[in-house]
Curated annotation (Swiss-Prot):
Gene Ontology cellular-component terms listed: cytosol
A Pfam family matched in the record: RimP_N
Organism: Prochlorococcus marinus (strain MIT 9515)
Family (UniProt): Belongs to the RimP family.
Protein name, UniProt field: Ribosome maturation factor RimP
Keywords, ordered alphabetically: Cytoplasm, Ribosome biogenesis
Length: 155
């Protein structure tokens, strides 16, 4: 029942999201709670940041479509939020925003004992990633990089 309910809610909420140039990034139903909690994470279709106003504008129409669908026969709490900042850096914008921040770089070098590098994000080009490790710039070809993520401190 939960999977079918979730799918039906996603279909309805996607239609509402389109009206605001949004998309439903994820929808979770916490049915073990009383009242149940519907957590919806939204994104803008143009990839700009979500504001509190975007969440607020989406809330009432989303609530109305859920109520009018009669899919839920119980009370619920609706939570609308943005995706927030991911620890993993993927977009060009991420690399510009977090230049100088401490990062962990997971490597896929099969013949190397080094699987993780830690340093300050220095530069990203189309071919390589450069990080500052204790004052020395290390350039890592992107074909050797598995994942780049923010970390809380430099080890």
């Amino acid at each position: 029942m939960d999977k079918e309910l979730k799918n039906n809610l996603e279909i309805l909420l996607e239609e509402v999201a389109k009206e605001f140039n949004l998309k439903v990034y994820s929808l979770n139903l916490l049915t073990n709670q009383n009242p149940i909690i519907i957590k919806i994470i939204i994104k803008k279709t143009n990839e700009e940041d979500i504001t509190i106003e975007d969440c607020s504008r989406f809330n009432n129409p989303a609530s109305a479509v859920i109520e009018n669908s009669n899919l839920l026969k119980c009370s619920y709490v609706l939570e609308i939020s943005s995706q927030g900042v991911s620890d993993e850096l993927t977009s060009e914008r991420d690399f510009k925003t977090f230049k100088g921040f401490p990062v962990n770089v997971e490597l896929n070098q099969k013949n190397s004992r080094i699987k993780l590098l830690n340093g300050l994000l220095y530069e990203k080009s189309k071919d390589y990633l450069a990080i500052n490790i204790k004052g020395k710039i290390k350039k890592i070809p992107f074909n050797e990089v598995l994942k780049i993520s923010l970390c809380t401190r430099q080890d």
